[in-house]
Design a protein with these regions (language model features):
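Zn-dependent metallo-beta-lactamase
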Residues: 1-20, 27-30, 96, 101-103, ...
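Short active-site oxyanion
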Residues: 3, 63-68, 132-134
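Pre-active-site segment of Zn-dependent metallo-hydrolases
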Residues: 13-51, 56-60, 110-115, 140-152
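Active-site neighborhood of phospho(di)ester-bond hydrolases with catalytic His/Asp-centered motifs
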Residues: 22-24, 42-50, 70-73, 135-140, ...
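Active-site environment of divalent metal-dependent phosphoester hydrolases
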Residues: 29-30, 51-56, 76-79, 93-96, ...
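Active-site HxH/HxHxD metal-binding segment of metal-dependent hydrolases
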Residues: 34-113
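Binuclear metal-ion centers of metallo-dependent hydrolases, dominated by the metallo-beta-lactamase
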Residues: 68, 80-93, 174, 178-225
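Active-site-proximal loop/helix segments of hydrolase catalytic cores
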Residues: 112-179
Protein backbone atom coordinates (compact mmCIF):
# COMPACT_ATOMS: atom_id res chain seq x y z
CA UNK A 1 0.00 0.00 0.00
CA UNK A 2 1.26 3.48 -0.86
CA UNK A 3 0.88 6.89 0.72
CA UNK A 4 0.52 10.53 -0.36
CA UNK A 5 1.73 13.12 2.17
CA UNK A 6 1.17 16.84 1.64
CA UNK A 7 3.79 19.26 2.97
CA UNK A 8 2.28 22.57 1.91
CA UNK A 9 2.27 24.54 -1.36
CA UNK A 10 2.99 21.91 -4.07
CA UNK A 11 5.46 19.85 -2.03
CA UNK A 12 4.22 16.27 -1.97
CA UNK A 13 5.81 13.09 -0.64
CA UNK A 14 4.96 9.66 -2.02
CA UNK A 15 5.70 6.28 -0.49
CA UNK A 16 5.59 3.70 -3.26
CA UNK A 17 7.02 0.17 -3.28
CA UNK A 18 9.46 0.93 -0.49
CA UNK A 19 10.74 4.16 -2.06
CA UNK A 20 10.26 7.71 -0.83
CA UNK A 21 9.70 10.24 -3.59
CA UNK A 22 9.53 14.00 -3.08
CA UNK A 23 7.80 16.20 -5.66
CA UNK A 24 8.83 19.89 -5.75
CA UNK A 25 10.48 19.96 -2.28
CA UNK A 26 9.98 23.60 -1.26
CA UNK A 27 10.95 23.77 2.43
CA UNK A 28 13.10 26.86 3.08
CA UNK A 29 10.87 29.91 2.75
CA UNK A 30 7.66 27.86 2.70
CA UNK A 31 5.53 29.13 5.61
CA UNK A 32 3.18 26.14 5.38
CA UNK A 33 5.78 23.38 5.36
CA UNK A 34 5.56 21.02 8.32
CA UNK A 35 9.05 19.50 8.06
CA UNK A 36 12.62 20.81 8.12
CA UNK A 37 15.62 20.01 5.99
CA UNK A 38 17.14 18.14 8.91
CA UNK A 39 14.40 15.48 8.94
CA UNK A 40 13.91 15.19 5.18
CA UNK A 41 14.96 11.95 3.54
CA UNK A 42 14.12 10.36 0.21
CA UNK A 43 15.27 8.09 -2.58
CA UNK A 44 14.01 10.21 -5.50
CA UNK A 45 13.00 13.79 -6.21
CA UNK A 46 10.68 14.73 -9.09
CA UNK A 47 10.71 18.33 -10.32
CA UNK A 48 7.90 19.83 -12.38
CA UNK A 49 9.86 22.99 -13.21
CA UNK A 50 12.62 25.28 -12.02
CA UNK A 51 10.89 28.09 -10.13
CA UNK A 52 12.18 28.58 -6.60
CA UNK A 53 8.93 27.52 -4.93
CA UNK A 54 9.21 24.13 -6.67
CA UNK A 55 12.95 23.59 -7.19
CA UNK A 56 13.20 24.58 -3.55
CA UNK A 57 15.80 22.66 -1.56
CA UNK A 58 16.45 20.03 -4.21
CA UNK A 59 20.24 20.35 -4.22
CA UNK A 60 20.67 20.08 -0.45
CA UNK A 61 18.20 17.21 -0.14
CA UNK A 62 19.66 15.27 -3.07
CA UNK A 63 23.21 15.61 -1.76
CA UNK A 64 22.24 14.65 1.79
CA UNK A 65 20.37 11.53 0.67
CA UNK A 66 22.30 10.61 -2.48
CA UNK A 67 18.91 10.81 -4.17
CA UNK A 68 18.21 10.71 -7.90
CA UNK A 69 16.36 13.70 -9.34
CA UNK A 70 13.89 13.07 -12.17
CA UNK A 71 13.36 16.16 -14.31
CA UNK A 72 13.26 17.61 -17.81
CA UNK A 73 16.56 17.58 -19.68
CA UNK A 74 17.57 21.17 -18.97
CA UNK A 75 16.95 20.85 -15.24
CA UNK A 76 18.75 17.50 -15.13
CA UNK A 77 21.80 18.87 -16.96
CA UNK A 78 21.93 21.83 -14.56
CA UNK A 79 21.87 19.42 -11.63
CA UNK A 80 24.59 17.24 -13.18
CA UNK A 81 26.77 20.35 -13.08
CA UNK A 82 26.12 20.61 -9.34
CA UNK A 83 27.23 17.03 -8.74
CA UNK A 84 23.69 15.66 -8.44
CA UNK A 85 22.56 12.33 -9.90
CA UNK A 86 19.70 13.15 -12.25
CA UNK A 87 17.61 11.24 -14.76
CA UNK A 88 16.72 13.47 -17.70
CA UNK A 89 13.36 13.14 -19.44
CA UNK A 90 11.13 15.28 -21.60
CA UNK A 91 7.45 15.91 -22.24
CA UNK A 92 5.54 12.88 -23.46
CA UNK A 93 8.28 10.48 -22.42
CA UNK A 94 7.95 7.79 -19.76
CA UNK A 95 10.44 5.65 -17.89
CA UNK A 96 10.31 2.85 -15.36
CA UNK A 97 11.86 3.20 -11.91
CA UNK A 98 11.88 0.78 -8.95
CA UNK A 99 8.81 2.52 -7.49
CA UNK A 100 6.79 2.64 -10.72
CA UNK A 101 6.54 4.37 -14.07
CA UNK A 102 6.88 8.14 -14.56
CA UNK A 103 5.50 10.05 -17.54
CA UNK A 104 5.91 13.78 -18.08
CA UNK A 105 2.96 15.71 -19.47
CA UNK A 106 2.40 19.20 -20.77
CA UNK A 107 1.92 22.08 -18.36
CA UNK A 108 1.18 25.63 -19.48
CA UNK A 109 3.41 27.83 -17.36
CA UNK A 110 7.03 29.05 -17.48
CA UNK A 111 10.27 27.74 -16.05
CA UNK A 112 13.58 29.23 -14.99
CA UNK A 113 15.91 28.58 -12.10
CA UNK A 114 16.31 30.99 -9.18
CA UNK A 115 19.59 32.24 -10.71
CA UNK A 116 17.82 33.02 -14.00
CA UNK A 117 19.06 29.96 -15.90
CA UNK A 118 16.61 28.68 -18.52
CA UNK A 119 15.05 25.49 -17.17
CA UNK A 120 13.29 24.07 -20.22
CA UNK A 121 9.56 23.46 -20.43
CA UNK A 122 7.42 23.04 -17.31
CA UNK A 123 5.78 19.65 -16.82
CA UNK A 124 3.07 17.75 -15.09
CA UNK A 125 3.81 14.21 -13.99
CA UNK A 126 1.93 10.91 -14.07
CA UNK A 127 3.17 8.23 -11.68
CA UNK A 128 1.86 4.68 -11.98
CA UNK A 129 2.59 2.24 -9.16
CA UNK A 130 0.86 -0.99 -8.14
CA UNK A 131 -2.14 -0.28 -10.34
CA UNK A 132 -2.70 3.25 -8.98
CA UNK A 133 -2.15 6.38 -11.06
CA UNK A 134 -1.26 9.76 -9.55
CA UNK A 135 -1.22 12.99 -11.56
CA UNK A 136 0.63 15.99 -10.15
CA UNK A 137 -0.13 18.89 -12.48
CA UNK A 138 2.73 21.12 -11.30
CA UNK A 139 2.06 24.79 -12.02
CA UNK A 140 -0.29 25.17 -14.97
CA UNK A 141 -3.13 26.98 -16.60
CA UNK A 142 -6.20 25.07 -17.68
CA UNK A 143 -5.66 23.55 -21.12
CA UNK A 144 -7.88 21.41 -23.30
CA UNK A 145 -5.36 18.57 -23.66
CA UNK A 146 -6.11 17.69 -20.04
CA UNK A 147 -9.14 16.01 -21.55
CA UNK A 148 -6.81 13.86 -23.65
CA UNK A 149 -4.74 12.99 -20.57
CA UNK A 150 -7.96 11.86 -18.89
CA UNK A 151 -9.04 9.84 -21.92
CA UNK A 152 -5.71 8.03 -22.19
CA UNK A 153 -5.15 7.40 -18.48
CA UNK A 154 -7.42 6.28 -15.66
CA UNK A 155 -6.30 8.68 -12.94
CA UNK A 156 -6.99 7.77 -9.33
CA UNK A 157 -5.59 10.91 -7.70
CA UNK A 158 -5.11 14.33 -9.33
CA UNK A 159 -3.20 17.05 -7.49
CA UNK A 160 -4.28 20.37 -9.00
CA UNK A 161 -3.21 23.96 -8.28
CA UNK A 162 -6.10 26.23 -7.26
CA UNK A 163 -4.42 29.43 -6.03
CA UNK A 164 -4.99 31.57 -9.15
CA UNK A 165 -2.67 34.46 -10.15
CA UNK A 166 0.21 32.16 -11.23
CA UNK A 167 -1.86 29.06 -12.03
CA UNK A 168 -5.44 27.92 -12.41
CA UNK A 169 -7.94 29.33 -9.96
CA UNK A 170 -10.83 27.41 -8.45
CA UNK A 171 -13.21 27.40 -11.42
CA UNK A 172 -10.53 26.46 -13.93
CA UNK A 173 -9.30 23.70 -11.63
CA UNK A 174 -12.84 22.31 -11.40
CA UNK A 175 -13.00 22.22 -15.20
CA UNK A 176 -9.59 20.50 -15.20
CA UNK A 177 -10.98 17.88 -12.84
CA UNK A 178 -13.83 17.30 -15.29
CA UNK A 179 -11.42 16.94 -18.20
CA UNK A 180 -9.13 14.57 -16.31
CA UNK A 181 -12.02 12.50 -14.92
CA UNK A 182 -9.92 11.60 -11.89
CA UNK A 183 -11.54 9.78 -8.98
CA UNK A 184 -10.10 11.99 -6.23
CA UNK A 185 -8.91 15.58 -6.42
CA UNK A 186 -6.32 17.03 -4.02
CA UNK A 187 -5.85 20.83 -4.14
CA UNK A 188 -2.31 22.23 -4.07
CA UNK A 189 -0.52 25.57 -4.60
CA UNK A 190 -2.81 27.75 -2.50
CA UNK A 191 -2.71 29.83 0.71
CA UNK A 192 1.09 29.79 0.89
CA UNK A 193 1.13 33.52 0.19
CA UNK A 194 -1.60 36.16 0.17
CA UNK A 195 -1.59 36.45 -3.63
CA UNK A 196 -2.62 32.78 -4.00
CA UNK A 197 -5.20 32.68 -1.23
CA UNK A 198 -8.16 30.45 -2.14
CA UNK A 199 -11.29 29.16 -0.42
CA UNK A 200 -10.70 25.43 -0.27
CA UNK A 201 -14.22 24.80 1.02
CA UNK A 202 -15.63 26.45 -2.10
CA UNK A 203 -13.37 24.25 -4.21
CA UNK A 204 -14.50 21.14 -2.35
CA UNK A 205 -18.17 21.99 -2.87
CA UNK A 206 -17.67 22.57 -6.57
CA UNK A 207 -15.71 19.34 -7.01
CA UNK A 208 -18.38 17.37 -5.18
CA UNK A 209 -21.06 19.01 -7.36
CA UNK A 210 -19.50 17.31 -10.42
CA UNK A 211 -19.52 13.93 -8.68
CA UNK A 212 -15.86 13.79 -7.70
CA UNK A 213 -14.22 13.31 -4.33
CA UNK A 214 -12.09 16.13 -2.92
CA UNK A 215 -9.52 15.63 -0.16
CA UNK A 216 -7.91 18.86 1.05
CA UNK A 217 -4.88 17.77 3.05
CA UNK A 218 -3.36 19.98 5.72
CA UNK A 219 0.45 20.08 5.75
CA UNK A 220 1.68 16.88 7.36
CA UNK A 221 -1.52 14.97 6.66
CA UNK A 222 -1.61 11.93 4.42
CA UNK A 223 -3.84 9.40 2.71
CA UNK A 224 -3.26 5.72 2.07
CA UNK A 225 -3.60 4.66 -1.55
Amino acid sequence: MGKIIFHGHSFTELHLKGSKILIDPFISGNPLCDISLDNTNCDYIILTHGHGDHFGDTIDIAKKNDATVIATAELAYYLHGKGITAHDMNLGGSHGFPFGRVKLTLAHHSSSLPDGTYAGEPAGVLIESDGKLIYHAGDTALFYDMKLIGEMHRINYALLPIGDNYTMGIDDAVKAAEFLNAETIIPIHYNTFEVIRADVDEFRRKIESIGKKCIALLPGNSIEI
